[in-house]
Amino acid sequence: MGQSFSRWLERQWYGHTGWQLILRPFSWLFYILIALRRLAYRLRLFKSLKLSVPVIIVGNINVGGTGKTPFVIWLVQQLRQNGWYPGIISRGYGGKSIHTHQVTKDSLPQEVGDEPVLLVQRTGLPLYVGRKRTRAARHLLRDYPECNLIISDDGLQHYALERDMEIVIIDGERIFGNGQLLPAGPLREPSSRLEDVDAVVFNGGPPAAGGYLMQLIPEDLRKVSAPQERMALNELIGQHVHAVAGIGNPQRFFGQLEQLGLVVEAHPFPDHHAYTEDDFEFAKDDIVLMTEKDAVKCIAFARENWWFMPISAEIDRALAEKILARLTRLMEKEI
């Protein structure tokens, strides 16, 4: 039921159907509500928390994943190489926990969300999740006073937290879908919102003027049940694999595998899907290949021939220089 509805929604948002016209009046109402809410924050009718350290928001204006996680990993690498010690906060989408607490590499994805667990495993940084990002940020800085910067994974629309930089990630293949706001389309805010942000990063596809291109580079496969074991991707060229993806745009993953020469039988799932062993009845003893985000949720019941494909982001060095220069100016103001 959930998967069917999710796929139906995507067809409406990224296609051209009559449902868009029916839902459009609700989108106009949604626009009025979000415009009034943002105005209230600008007029300081609603309070925003100003932290003692710089805050970088990495978000999007679309519903669903656009590639924020690999970007955050890249951003952490750039910052660490230049002397910064960031902490990360997240809403923890897909997790059941209602409390604010720290995520560790052994945290359960079903409790804290799949992306936070993956980020901790890949970066080793302190990361706190919570329904209120302001509270998560406070807890993080209290427990890790050595952190001198906060990265908010998502949270572009969370105006209760003041920010020093906003970076938006866009799916370069699907862009804005039909261009409509929720519920007629996939947009949380109108595309004009991009005029106010500091940088726009396109995950694949040619970037628009002034934007930055992010390319996702596949690495050696790792075994889901024993990530220390590796296998070169070229060992599977020409072989049939069951490809599993519960991400914002599963077709991107499937297409990437096909371009690499694999014979792909695709199994798309909704973003943040909570996998069970029953989801893999199709697999039998065949090879299963999934994303790293999916793998963190399948370790408990993974079979011997299940593998995941880590990816790393490559982005124009000019963006890193822009971010670092902005942070330098911010720190000079504090002195």
UniProtKB/Swiss-Prot annotation:
Ranges annotated as spanning the membrane: none
Summary of the function given for this chain in its UniProt record: Transfers the gamma-phosphate of ATP to the 4'-position of a tetraacyldisaccharide 1-phosphate intermediate (termed DS-1-P) to form tetraacyldisaccharide 1,4'-bis-phosphate (lipid IVA).
GO MF term list: ATP binding; tetraacyldisaccharide 4'-kinase activity
Record gene name: lpxK
Name of this chain's protein: Tetraacyldisaccharide 4'-kinase
Binding residues for ATP: 62-69
Signal peptide: none
EC number: 2.7.1.130
Native source species: Methylobacillus flagellatus (strain ATCC 51484 / DSM 6875 / VKM B-1610 / KT)
Protein family membership: Belongs to the LpxK family.
GO-annotated biological processes: lipid A biosynthetic process; lipopolysaccharide core region biosynthetic process
